[in-house]
Amino acid sequence: MTVSCPPPSTSEREEQARALCLRLLTARSRTRAELAGQLAKRGYPEDIGNRVLDRLAAVGLVDDTDFAEQWVQSRRANAAKSKRALAAELHAKGVDDDVITTVLGGIDAGAERGRAEKLVRARLRREVLIDDGTDEARVSRRLVAMLARRGYGQTLACEVVIAELAAERERRRV
């Protein structure tokens, strides 16, 4: 004869959900939406998830604004992503649009252009440019594609690549 165990009480389920969230937050900071998704995936009711997440937010363990600021700082430094790419990543992580706008508001267009120029310059140093310019179109396509993968707009990418290619040709000529 099989004896079925009663389901854990609400407070037990809440404690299990809290423990899961704390375990997930140990590895890296997460957004409220990411934690809610993990709780739902594991079968926790929405009301329990909301109570647990509200408690964690009250003590400062879940803060989407802080997460977004850290994410932007890290991704701009390590991956050289553009504002557009960062906004898409934050949106995919469930950060509110108002928070995204606020966090990305501190990045000006000049800084973004400067970062694109730095990326192109670094890549151009490793490129072999033939003096007759036959492979310049190939190099140009590669550089524009590199910037596009990082979320830079086509107009900005083309302008930066043309200017940096001209500067690199001049530098190598001297």
Curated annotation (Swiss-Prot):
Location of this chain's protein in the cell: Cytoplasm
Top-level taxon in the UniProt lineage: Bacteria
InterPro entries, A to Z: RecX_HTH_1st (IPR053926), RecX_HTH_2nd (IPR053924), Regulatory_RecX (IPR003783), WH-like_DNA-bd_sf (IPR036388)
One GO CC annotation: cytoplasm
Assigned keywords, A-Z: Cytoplasm
Primary location recorded for the protein, binned into one broad class: cytoplasm
Pfam family, one: RecX_HTH2
GO terms for biological process, alphabetical: regulation of DNA repair
Annotated function: Binds to RecA inhibiting ATP hydrolysis and the generation of heteroduplex DNA. It might act as an anti-recombinase to quell inappropriate recombinational repair during normal DNA metabolism. It is essential for cell survival.
Entry similarity comment: Belongs to the RecX family.
Protein name per UniProt: Regulatory protein RecX
Native organism taxonomy: Bacteria, Bacillati, Actinomycetota, Actinomycetes, Mycobacteriales
